[in-house]
Amino acid sequence: MARLTLRPHNHFFSSPIYAHKQPFLSVYTIFPHHHQNPLIKSRVKCSASGTERVRESKKLPPKDPIEDPKPQLPIPEVLSTETGFEQNWPPWKNIPQRYKLIGATSLAFVICNMDKVNLSIAIIPMSHQFGWSSSVAGLVQSSFFWGYALSQLPGGWLSKIFGGRKVLEIGVFTWSFATALVPLLAGFMPGLIFSRILVGIGEGVSPSAATDLIARTIPVKERSRAVGFVFGGLSLGSVMGLLLAPPIIETFNWESVFYLFGLLGVGWFVGFQFLNEEEVSYKGNEISTSHKSENATKEELGSSLKEIPWKSFFQSPAVWAMIYTHFCGSWGHYTCLSWLPTYFSEALSLNLTEAAWVSILPPLASIVVTSLASQFADYLITNGVDTTTVRKICQTIAFVAPAICMTLSSVDIGLPPWEIVGILTAGLALSSFALSGLYCTHQDISPEYASILLGITNTVGAVPGIVGVALTGFLLDSTHSWTMSLFVPSIFFYLTGTVVWLAFASSEPQTFRKEDS
């Protein structure tokens, strides 16, 4: 019998700081020697108190002396799951679960806008192939917003009942599947419109689902960065969609864009199933586990809908401020998203290739601004600045900056085209400060009802996608003026939205009670 005692001190297997948390660590090692000598198997046990014992030391039976086995290679140490390399592999193993969820949600939003903008590129060859007029092409593109507007409130309600995680993954699968259906239904107009409505429904429930997920997993001091990171995926998705769609269409055909982009969403849905950790709910500064029911009965769903304090929502000036501000921001966003490429081509005399590349600049710059704005907001909150003040500062920048830039672009002061492009890009990029202003306020005032509140404001915010885009075209035909049709309405809503926001917005937690309804 051989006895071996090892006394580890301050190596990577054990740490004196955490010794009281781990009662013992067990390490098994087989020491190879010359082939004529037997192997010695030892077990080393390191207790929390620092004492060691050799519980067993056993001499193995010698091998047949006739045999001349090859020298045995060292056998690696088998480590417990709480020590050594297994503790840090894979690299993302020790990343907090809430950050994994936020990263996956941001990726979903990247795919979201890729599937939103792909039609704006593919509509050109589709119109040529099927002989669509501009009115028909406009009808196909606007059908997305029908589903988007109709799904906002249901998305918020379902997120409240089942949790944002479940609603988000169903939304991603719905819009991805519907995207892949477009080539199959393109020759049948009702079917094509229905598929785009489904895309709108799937994408429409996602903002509320993400808001619920953020409200339940991210503390206030990290919330601006989380919202900026998640919703910033929309800008990245616009850039990637506008960059990838043209070469895919030129290399293959327009159908391949919908198949490939739809497949990305299905792949995300499959991968998201591996994030099975439970959600956490922030109540004040504490974290408590929250399990959502996935088998609610119809009676429970109906009861939960009745329990939502709808009247209390609409009695709050802060909620009305969010509603109008969301409408104003969406007017500028959707009208510019739809009409700026045409403006660059007609008013600034850029060719189609230049106009397409220039259209990428605002969302590309928004990615940088979003990161800076979120860090700026969280820095102010961490250093004691009132949350309401921070939200008002950020939202004011988001509205005043594009209003000034649009004014400079619309006034004939002899600016060359590329300077106008730069001014508009800067203004629209700075509007991303809204992600640290308006879009954080839903979680600030009520984490419990954040998804429903965003559903309310986003429903109103979807109206400019239907009305504003069409009205801009009508005004352009009537006045033949880009200033009056595109810029003046946007400037009006930006400025009035700023006034309402500064007067009535609040990030103070509010209690919405059913008995008040």
Curated annotation (Swiss-Prot):
Ranges annotated as spanning the membrane: 130-150, 170-190, 229-249, 255-275, 312-332, 352-372, 397-417, 420-440, 452-472, 484-504
Keywords for this protein: Chloroplast, Membrane, Plastid, Transit peptide, Transmembrane, Transmembrane helix
PROSITE patterns hit by this protein: MFS
Tissue: Expressed in leaf veins and sepals.
Biased composition (Basic and acidic residues): 52-70
Subcellular location, record wording: Plastid, Chloroplast membrane
Record GO terms (molecular function): phosphate transmembrane transporter activity
Cellular component terms (Gene Ontology): chloroplast membrane; plastid
Record's bilayer topology term: Multi-pass membrane protein
Record flagged with keyword Transmembrane: yes
Record keyword Chloroplast present: yes
Region feature Disordered, mapped onto this chain: 51-73
Gene3D superfamilies in the record: MFS general substrate transporter like domains
Any Pfam family: MFS_1
Induction description: Expressed with a circadian rhythm showing a peak during the middle of the day (under long day conditions).
Entries under CDD domains matching the protein: MFS_SLC17A9_like
A GO biological-process term: defense response
Disulphide-bridged cysteine pairs: none
PANTHER family: ANION TRANSPORTER 6, CHLOROPLASTIC-RELATED, SOLUTE CARRIER FAMILY 17
Annotated function: Inorganic phosphate and probable anion transporter.
Entry's family note: Belongs to the major facilitator superfamily. Sodium/anion cotransporter (TC 2.A.1.14) family.
UniProt protein name: Probable anion transporter 6, chloroplastic
Record organism: Arabidopsis thaliana (Mouse-ear cress)
